[in-house]
Regions:
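Small/polar beta-strand repeat architecture
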Residues: 65-142
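Glycine-enriched, solvent-exposed interface loops adjoining structured elements
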Residues: 1-67, 93, 138-276
Length: 276
């Protein structure tokens, strides 16, 4: 179906006059549909892990090399890093790795900014002589997680993170905050719903849901009936709800607490296996 045909489905749900070309028609209903088309499209895509709008990406971290950087004693026994235009502020948290000579620098640190070119690793202990050119660092989440990954610019909904084929619950633990993905993994194999704008490839079940959602947003403007918009919203939710019940709609997954070997749960499982 074309964009105009899809928009006309939405207009027909409102018993409104349809458009000849939704991108150029100047009728009030065409202008209303154009205004709401993209917001409704993205909301509908994000409402469910639609197969036609799901793709994969691998997210990796970009580390900053410590080339041309000096590590020394700050005069109080802590490690001071001299790195031109480091860009850090006091209280930020960083990971440092592969440092040779001053191996105590390897780890996770909160930093204190001295000036634009130097910072201290809080509560570190300086020892040794830095081997020039070794080591790298990266900014870490402030607490709770080890790494933060930039999501693809076309991401609308994360489906699976470092998971196995099958149920969404197979995903590794993660959280999404401020458009970044927080994880304890350095590499993320991501499956996500993207901003699919090629209407010719949309599936009919998605088109049906989208038409109802789009109509719900323009109903009050076109029909002057708030109630009609609410009814169409419920119609959209009824189309999507069965899929939602079969899929986890959260934008994160918490860590799983493993039961101890002597827990009642483990004991019950061992008993069941023994008595099989």
């Amino acid at each position: 179906m074309t964009k105009t045909e899809i928009c006309n489905l939405a207009l027909s749900l409102l018993s409104a006059n349809t458009a000849t070309d939704i991108d150029t028609d100047t009728t009030p209903q065409a202008e209303a549909v154009r205004r709401w088309f993209a917001p409704a499209r993205d909301e509908c895509l994000a409402s469910h892990p639609w197969n036609f709008a799901t793709k994969r990406a691998r997210l990796t971290l970009t580390w900053t090399a410590l080339s041309g950087v000096a590590l020394a004693d700050n005069g109080s026994g802590e490690i001071r890093v001299t790195h031109t235009s480091h860009g850090l502020t006091t209280g930020q948290r960083i990971h440092m790795q592969d440092v040779e000579g001053v191996t105590a620098a390897n780890g996770t640190w909160y930093v204190t900014r001295i000036d634009a070119d130097t910072y201290d690793l809080d509560a570190s202990v300086f020892a040794g002589t830095h081997t020039s050119g070794t080591g790298e660092w990266i900014v870490a989440p402030l607490h709770g997680w080890d790494y933060k990954h930039t999501l693809p610019t076309d991401n609308l909904r994360v489906v699976r993170v470092n998971g196995y084929e099958g149920n969404e619950e197979d995903s590794a633990p993660y959280a999404i905050e401020e458009s970044v993905l927080l994880s304890d993994d350095t590499i993320i194999d991501l499956q996500y719903v993207y901003q699919h704008t090629t209407v010719a490839n949309w599936t009919q079940d998605f088109i049906n849901a989208f038409a109802a959602l789009l109509a719900s947003y323009v109903a009050a403007e076109i029909t002057e009936s708030v109630g009609r918009g609410e009814t169409l919203r419920k119609q959209f939710e009824a189309i999507v709800a069965p899929q939602k019940r079969r899929n986890d709609a959260r934008t994160g997954k918490g860590r799983t607490l493993q039961p101890t070997f002597n827990s009642q749960l483990v004991a019950a499982r061992r008993s069941s296996i023994t008595n099989w």
